[in-house]
């Protein structure tokens, strides 16, 4: 028997079946680095319209986690897809390098500044530590396949950036947004520093809940207000609080002007409460026998005075809109030094902003004999005992409530009035302008707009000063006596910035005031405070984007971070940009959810459900991680687990196998010589290219809308359904058995070439390593890298006016599906082995029959059977299977007649009819020794 294997065009490619990504990717990265791929892309895109995604800087502390990976991969997908869409999209990664976490790490190793090291040496150690952390994180980000200017990232500790941060503050001061005040701010006693809003988390805490009586000074005046005379015992106004430790700072009692307040007789005293809360208060304090003697509006009680239970002074009743009937007594303990609402109303009434608490959280000397030097969180019991002793405590119980805590230490924080510098939200209209700017930004998902609007509308002034060592100095001089800023502040700040640009922030601390102020130096002091690190990152639109040459003066198009950054980076950037320039720093803001495990639980080392990106890359490869990110809807929580990553790996194999099939069947194809014109191609091949064209339209729309999970779903549908289970199956016969250089085969290869050119580009933003690998195996002249090009423009489709248009082939797909069901049943019943052992008769109603008949003998190639006949629907025998999908179709199957051709495996009656090739069928004889078969349709 002759061996006809050599006459077949069997698929052949060096592109490996297995991805082996974990081993292969590092080699590709080395090539990208050696070639300066990022530089090649920049050169190729020079002069194109720009798209700038400004990198929100991760903190330079610790290894990257799965959340970092999600963030950087999403950014990279966008930057690469924009490049393919014809944009110049430079990506400059950055790091946030100042601040407390780095200080704490350095303190752990070297002690606090001033112990073993001077403050200058301590800062140098912080800089050194941050640089080491940047290097570690950079390696992992590069390993993810993220392309960017990794050799020249921006660091907030770069001297030039530090100088520009000072300049940003100068601009804000020049625009009139800065003010100083002894204002209550979030204060962490462990950090010994003020905290920004974004540095506060809320946890449940158990505190004493107390009702306290403040006795009236002028009892008769109160009786007159309530129009009563028969009161038994003293009259008191009752407050409720869960922070007894703040009572030493009490300077007033706030009541609501429009609420009704009742005078209630209980035993041998009378108390004043909001009328609507009388019943709940009586239940709480265990009183069943009480009488309401009279009621008045809160406004009637304004400025009446009451005795502080133990501090020895009296306090006024004042009117406040912040008083509610949600809980308590309707009268609010007011300590202007310990709360923002209290502070605001205190300013209105000219109250003292008392702050009896030191930076370490202990009462200052002279507060109260039994409280001096006591930690405030240990003082609650002492205060409760004091109130009991004075007869002012009506009730005490334990209560669990949500309490602000430090994001680093997870310990409770306090509000504490300290002299601080603030960016005012209202003195120059910053709040109003910011709210206006928010409306001009596209928020993705769109609920982000309402979220940040609410935060901006309700946020307090921004406390930007910190009492730390490792941070950008505020670089201000204030008068020793008046505490006013120097009249030449902006000029002086520019002088400081110039020095910092050369020597870094240490230049400020080394500066002798006389160098800049001359004879005035004795009248001024250098402000020792540093800037909140959120000011560092929030000003990068100015300190980085505005000055980097590759951004050419363009503002950022997009900021992309986790959804917690509405109150973090998005907020600080908006505040600073609006305060400096009167406009938002971004056009689009995209947020992604947090990563959770397969059961939807938060990632936690204690639970042991964390997924390490380094482990995933070492086991499965970065492309699997990238595919997981892209295929997950990032607008909600993003679930990741070994099982979920395994599913991503399965999807990857389907895409890789499709690419490999295309490459293997393009063996020997030279697009410069072998391309078949569209009008001369087999109709099915033109349909396949049209499928790619339709898929590309969907995929490009999804990339444009940042719907990457839609990109992956459409890509999978194209590979699995349109190609894998239909087209690629059908063409194997023609591809393998036709004459190598025949139009029938070259038509098929032309289609595969167009599809491969499109597919490799669709993959590139997501499966960057695999796309680069595929690119290297594609035939024809091309640029070295897929990333320098644009979406493929060589696709075309069938015209609707053609008889065999897309609708025709869509119906054929359904017919093929129905035939497959019948064949599968026949195989299960052991009637046939494979589909080529079968012959089918399609009993069809006239319209469908005409379409099927139009394919002639080529219908069998579409159905993958050795025979296919079309007959009238009404002639169908009883055993013909009625289609569930196509009402006008029945399918009958029989065993194919004739012998099996060993070359094409079809069963035909003409095997051995040609003496010279006695073992093969007539079609194969033509393909081996004749002019080759002609294919028109399939």
Swiss-Prot record:
Its main location: cytoplasm. The keyword Aminoacyl-tRNA synthetase applies. It catalyses: tRNA(Ile) + L-isoleucine + ATP = L-isoleucyl-tRNA(Ile) + AMP + diphosphate. Its cofactor is Zn(2+). Keywords: Acetylation, Aminoacyl-tRNA synthetase, ATP-binding, Cytoplasm, Ligase, Metal-binding, Nucleotide-binding, Protein biosynthesis, Zinc. It comes from the Bacteria. Its EC number is 6.1.1.5. Binds 1 zinc ion per subunit. CDD domains: Anticodon_Ia_Ile_BEm (cd07960), IleRS_core (cd00818). GO terms for biological process: isoleucyl-tRNA aminoacylation. GO terms for molecular function: aminoacyl-tRNA deacylase activity; ATP binding; isoleucine-tRNA ligase activity; tRNA binding; zinc ion binding. One of its GO terms (cellular component) is cytosol. Belongs to the class-I aminoacyl-tRNA synthetase family. IleS type 1 subfamily. PANTHER family: ISOLEUCINE--TRNA LIGASE, MITOCHONDRIAL, SOLEUCYL-TRNA SYNTHETASE. Monomer. IleRS has two distinct active sites: one for aminoacylation and one for editing. The misactivated valine is translocated from the active site to the editing site, which sterically excludes the correctly activated isoleucine. The single editing site contains two valyl binding pockets, one specific for each substrate (Val-AMP or Val-tRNA(Ile)). This is Isoleucine--tRNA ligase. It comes from Shigella dysenteriae serotype 1 (strain Sd197).
């Amino acid at each position: 028997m002759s061996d006809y294997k050599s006459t077949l065009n069997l698929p052949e490619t060096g592109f490996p079946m297995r991805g082996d990504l974990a081993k292969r990717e590092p080699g590709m990265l080395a090539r990208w680095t050696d070639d300066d791929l990022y530089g090649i892309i920049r050169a190729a895109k020079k002069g194109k319209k720009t798209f700038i995604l400004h990198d929100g800087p991760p903190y330079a502390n610790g290894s990257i986690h799965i959340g970092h990976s999600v963030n950087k991969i999403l950014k990279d997908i966008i930057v690469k897809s924009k490049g393919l869409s014809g944009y110049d999209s430079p990506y400059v990664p950055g790091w946030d390098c100042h601040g407390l976490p780095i200080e704490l790490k350095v303190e752990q190793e070297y002690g606090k500044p001033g112990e073993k090291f001077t403050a200058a040496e301590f800062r140098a150690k912080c800089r050194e530590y941050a640089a080491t952390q940047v290097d570690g994180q950079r390696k992992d980000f590069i390993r993810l396949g993220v392309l960017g200017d990794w050799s020249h990232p921006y660091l907030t500790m770069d001297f030039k950036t530090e100088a520009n941060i000072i300049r940003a503050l100068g601009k804000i001061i020049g625009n009139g947004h800065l003010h100083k005040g002894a204002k209550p701010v979030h204060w962490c006693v462990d950090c010994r520093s003020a905290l920004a809003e974004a540095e506060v988390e809320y946890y449940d805490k158990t505190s004493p809940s107390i009702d306290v009586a403040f006795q009236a000074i002028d009892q008769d005046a109160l009786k007159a207000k309530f129009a009563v005379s028969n009161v038994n015992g003293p009259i008191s106004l009752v407050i409720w609080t869960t922070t007894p430790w703040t009572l030493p700072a009490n300077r007033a009692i706030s009541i609501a002007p429009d609420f009704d307040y009742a005078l209630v007789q209980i035993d041998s005293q009378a108390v004043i409460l909001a009328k609507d809360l009388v019943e709940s208060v009586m239940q709480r304090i265990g009183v069943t026998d009480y009488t309401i003697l009279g009621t008045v509006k809160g406004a009637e009680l304004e400025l009446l005075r009451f005795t502080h239970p133990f501090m020895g002074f009296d306090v006024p009743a004042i009117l406040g809109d912040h008083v509610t009937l949600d809980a308590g007594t309707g009268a609010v303990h007011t300590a202007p030094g310990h709360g923002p609402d209290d502070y605001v109303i205190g300013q209105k009434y000219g109250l003292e902003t008392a702050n009896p608490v030191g930076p370490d959280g202990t009462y200052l000397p002279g507060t109260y004999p039994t409280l001096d030097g006591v930690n405030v969180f240990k003082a609650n019991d002492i205060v409760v005992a004091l109130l009991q002793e004075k007869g002012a405590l009506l009730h005490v119980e334990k209560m669990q409530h949500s309490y602000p805590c430090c994001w680093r230490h997870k310990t409770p924080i306090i509000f504490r009035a300290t002299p601080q510098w603030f960016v005012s939200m209202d003195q120059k209209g910053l709040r109003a302008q910011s709210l206006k700017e928010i409306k001009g930004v596209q928020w993705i998902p769109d609920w982000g707009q309402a979220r940040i609007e609410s935060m901006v509308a309700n946020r307090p002034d921004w406390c930007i000063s910190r009492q730390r060592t490792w941070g950008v100095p505020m670089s201000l001089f204030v008068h020793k006596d008046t505490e006013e800023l120097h009249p030449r502040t902006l000029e002086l700040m520019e002088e400081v910035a110039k020095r910092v640009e050369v020597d870094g922030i240490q230049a400020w601390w080394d500066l002798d005031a006389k160098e800049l102020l001359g004879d005035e130096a004795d009248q001024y002091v250098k402000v020792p405070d540093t800037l909140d690190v959120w000011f560092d990152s929030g000003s990068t639109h100015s300190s980085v984007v505005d000055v980097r040459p590759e951004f050419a003066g363009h503002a950022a198009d997009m900021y992309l971070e986790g959804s917690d950054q509405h109150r973090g980076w998005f907020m600080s950037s908006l505040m600073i940009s609006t305060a400096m320039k009167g406009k938002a720093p971004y056009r689009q803001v995209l947020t992604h959810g947090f990563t959770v495990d397969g059961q939807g639980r938060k990632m936690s080392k204690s639970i042991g459900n964390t997924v390490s990106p380094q482990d995933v890359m070492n086991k499965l490869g970065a492309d699997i991680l990238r595919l997981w990110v892209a295929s997950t809807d990032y607008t909600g929580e993003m679930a990741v687990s070994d099982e979920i990553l395994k599913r991503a790996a399965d999807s990857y194999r389907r895409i890789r196998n499709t690419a490999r099939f295309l490459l293997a069947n393009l063996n020997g194809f030279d697009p410069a010589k072998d391309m078949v014109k569209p009008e001369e191609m087999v109709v099915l091949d033109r349909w396949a290219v049209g499928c790619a064209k339709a898929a590309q339209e969907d995929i490009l729309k999804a990339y444009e809308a940042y719907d990457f999970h839609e990109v992956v779903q459409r890509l999978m549908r194209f590979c699995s359904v349109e190609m894998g289970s239909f087209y690629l199956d059908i063409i194997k016969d023609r591809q393998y058995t036709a004459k190598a250089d025949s139009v029938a085969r070259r038509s098929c290869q032309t289609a595969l070439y167009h599809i491969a050119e499109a597919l490799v580009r669709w993959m590139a933003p997501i499966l960057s390593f695999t796309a680069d690998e595929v690119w290297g195996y594609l035939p024809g002249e091309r640029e070295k890298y897929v990333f320098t090009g644009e979406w493929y423009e060589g696709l075309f489709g069938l015209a609707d006016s053609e008889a065999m248009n897309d609708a025709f082939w869509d119906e054929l797909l359904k017919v093929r599906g129905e035939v497959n069901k019948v064949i599968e049943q026949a195989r299960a019943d052991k009637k046939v082995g494979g589909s080529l052992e079968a012959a089918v008769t399609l009993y069809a109603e006239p319209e469908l029959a005409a379409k099927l008949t139009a394919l002639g003998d080529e219908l069998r190639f579409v159905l993958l059977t050795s025979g296919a006949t079309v007959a009238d629907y009404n002639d169908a025998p009883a055993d013909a299977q009625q289609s569930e999908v196509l009402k006008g179709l029945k399918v009958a199957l029989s065993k194919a007649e004739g012998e099996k051709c060993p070359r094409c495996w079809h069963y035909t009656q003409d095997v051995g009819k040609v003496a010279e090739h006695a073992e093969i069928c007539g079609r194969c004889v033509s393909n081996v020794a004749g002019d080759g078969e002609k294919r028109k349709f399939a």
